[in-house]
């Protein structure tokens, strides 16, 4: 597993994207929030509480919240059709709090889905010193997203993510999806979610993750995240994630573990993948990379997880010169606490 390859993959999850959307079927209003030089448009801006149908076809965002509003709740809603974000909570300019519960957020991306690096169903961010974005994402059904299911970014963001069903496309060769991502110093917990079908079969040096905790490589570390009692993948075809849980917090040179403790916890998760579909995660031309749990950090705890299936049966685990398949990969970790995990081929 080459850290630079995976770093470039994970950064793309948040920082890239190339197009601004098709002709509008909704009333799409500029938000003042820019991505990829575009002033993002939204079908709804600071609407307070929302339920029911939100058809955002033609807009960049379905429902947009920022500090100029009073926050709100998205409950029992059906949000679809935007090409960048289904629900976006932007706390850059001040405190913003939104609950997203019992809702369906789907078909977020281009039509058809393609390899441009955007399309996130539920997105929280607070990337300034004075901002915050908080809330709960629970009981939601998230599917048919282009890049990511649920993403929480930056040190001012803190979200509890629990009881959601997040379904990727299965093995696809055009983009490396991630199911749930907490990164760039964000806080939160990820508990009792079901995440399946995040798998990349292309040749561009990438692996997908069911749950990704991302930091380091010159960015803030993401620390103290609890990942507990999630179901990641299943024995059904196309349900596996290339990496069940990826804890990725390298040093500033992106070549090894950081100097500070990351203290992330992966406990009591069921992680399954019966297929070998990744061919480039260990570097283009070198081979694939799949792992039940990947740890790049310091003093992380990997305890009492059940890992099974051909897709995580160890073969050349830790190699950087050929396809590497791991149940638990701590080859780039320091002081990892690995205890009472059950690994079944």
Language model features with spans:
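Bacterial N-terminal signal peptides
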Residues: 7-18
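Extracellular beta-strand/beta-solenoid scaffold signature
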Residues: 29-39, 57-65, 81-92, 111-129, ...
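Positively charged n-region of N-terminal signal peptides that target proteins for export
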Residues: 1-5
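Leucine-rich solenoid repeat scaffolds
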Residues: 299-345
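Sec/Tat signal peptide C-region and signal peptidase I cleavage site
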Residues: 20-25
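Parallel beta-helix/beta-solenoid
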Residues: 40, 45, 67-69, 74, ...
């Amino acid at each position: 597993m080459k850290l630079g390859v995976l770093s470039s993959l994970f950064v793309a999850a948040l920082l890239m994207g190339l197009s601004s959307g098709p002709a509008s079927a909704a009333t799409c209003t500029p938000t003042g929030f820019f991505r990829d030089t575009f002033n993002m448009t939204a079908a709804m801006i600071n609407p307070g509480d929302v339920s029911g149908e939100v058809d955002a076809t033609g807009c960049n965002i379905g429902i947009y919240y920022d500090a100029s509003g009073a926050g709100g709740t998205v409950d029992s809603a059906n949000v679809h059709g935007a090409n960048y974000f289904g629900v976006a909570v932007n706390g850059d300019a001040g405190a913003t709090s939104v609950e997203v519960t019992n809702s369906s957020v789907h078909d977020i991306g281009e039509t058809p889905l393609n390899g441009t690096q955007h399309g996130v169903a539920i997105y929280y961010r607070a990337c300034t010193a004075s901002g915050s974005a908080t809330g709960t994402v629970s009981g939601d059904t998230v599917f048919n997203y282009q890049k990511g299911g649920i993403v929480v970014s930056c040190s001012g963001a803190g979200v509890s993510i629990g009881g959601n069903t997040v379904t990727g496309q299965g093995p696809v060769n055009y983009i490396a999806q991630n199911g749930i991502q907490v990164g760039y110093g964000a806080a939160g917990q990820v508990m009792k979610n079901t995440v399946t079908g995040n798998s990349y079969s292309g040749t561009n040096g990438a692996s997908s993750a069911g749950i990704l905790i991302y930091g380091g490589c010159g960015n803030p570390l993401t620390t103290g995240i609890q990942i507990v009692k999630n179901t990641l993948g299943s024995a059904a075809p196309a349900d596996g994630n290339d990496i069940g849980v990826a804890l990725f917090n390298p040093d500033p040179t992106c070549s090894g573990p950081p100097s500070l403790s990351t203290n992330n916890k992966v406990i009591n998760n069921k992680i399954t993948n019966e297929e070998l579909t990744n061919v480039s995660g260990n570097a283009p031309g070198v081979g694939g990379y799949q792992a039940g749990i990947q740890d790049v950090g310091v003093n992380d705890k990997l305890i009492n997880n059940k890992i099974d299936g051909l897709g995580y049966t160890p073969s050349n685990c830790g190699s950087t010169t050929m396809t590497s398949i791991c149940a638990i990969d701590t080859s780039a970790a320091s002081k990892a606490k690995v205890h009472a995990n059950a690994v079944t081929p």
